[in-house]
Amino acid sequence: MRANSPTQGISLKMHQARPLFLVTVALQLIGLGYSYQSEGDGAREVSNILSPVIPGTTLDRTLSNSSRKNDIPEGARLWDSLPDSSTLGESAVPVSRCCHNGGTCVLGSFCVCPAYFTGRYCEHDQRRRDCGALGHGAWTLHSCRLCRCIFSALYCLPHQTFSHCDLKSFLSSGARGSRECSIPSLLLLVLCLLLQGVAGKG
C-alpha cells in the first residue's frame, strides 16, 4: 500500500479544516451571547408579527387543573421539575400503576397505549393537543418564562432572567442580534472556505 494514497490526502485535509469549523461555530455562539447581553431597553418595535394575541384567561381556562407550586404560574410546568424525566413532556411514574388512560403495563417499564393515547405512560391524549388559542408545539412568553404547548399542557423553561417581560422587545432583541452577527459570520465562513480551497490545492 502506498504511503500517499488519495484517501489519506482527503482525510488529512478534512483534519486540517475541522479546527477552522470549530472556531467558526465558537465565534458565532460568543457573538450571539454578547448581542443578547448588550441589548438595552430601547428595542425597536416589531411590526405585526405577534399574532394571535393570547389573553391570559384562555390558557388559564384550558390548564386550570394544574397546581401552583413554588411561585410557578398556574397552568405552567417547569421542564426541570419532572423528577424521572430525561425528555420533554414525560411525567413521573404513577404510584399505583405505570400506565394512564387504560394502557397496559409491560414488564413494569413501558406501556402499550389504547387508541388516541401516546407517551411513555399513555399520558397524552392526541385528540386534545392545543392550549386554547395556542397550537400544539407553539412557543409563548408566559409570566416572564418561555413556554411551549405540548399535548394541551404548557411547559416552561426554568430560571430565565429577562430584564423585561415584554414579548415585543424579547422578539426584536433576537432578530437584532442575529442581524448584527450575520455579516461577520458570513465573512468568517468565506475565509474558512478560501483556506480549505488553498489547503486542498497544496
Curated annotation (Swiss-Prot):
Disulphides: 98-105, 99-111, 113-122
Record keywords, A-Z: Cell membrane, Developmental protein, Disulfide bond, EGF-like domain, Gastrulation, Glycoprotein, GPI-anchor, Lipoprotein, Membrane, Secreted, Signal
Tissue expression summary: No expressed in adult tissues.
Phenotype upon gene inactivation: Positional defects in internal organs. The lung presents a right pulmonary isomerism. The stomach is located on either the left or the right and the spleen is small and has an abnormal shape. The apex of the heart pointed to the right or left. In addition malpositioning of heart outflow tracts is observed, the aorta is connected to the right ventricle and emerged from the heart in a ventral position and to the right of the pulmonary artery. This one is connected to either the left or the right ventricle.
Molecular function terms, GO-annotated: activin receptor binding
Compartment annotation: Cell membrane; Secreted
Bilayer topology: Lipid-anchor; GPI-anchor
Tree of life domain: Eukaryota
Gene3D superfamilies xref list: Laminin
Role of this protein: Nodal coreceptor involved in the correct establishment of the left-right axis. May play a role in mesoderm and/or neural patterning during gastrulation.
Protein's name according to its UniProt entry: Cryptic protein
Source organism (scientific name): Mus musculus (Mouse)
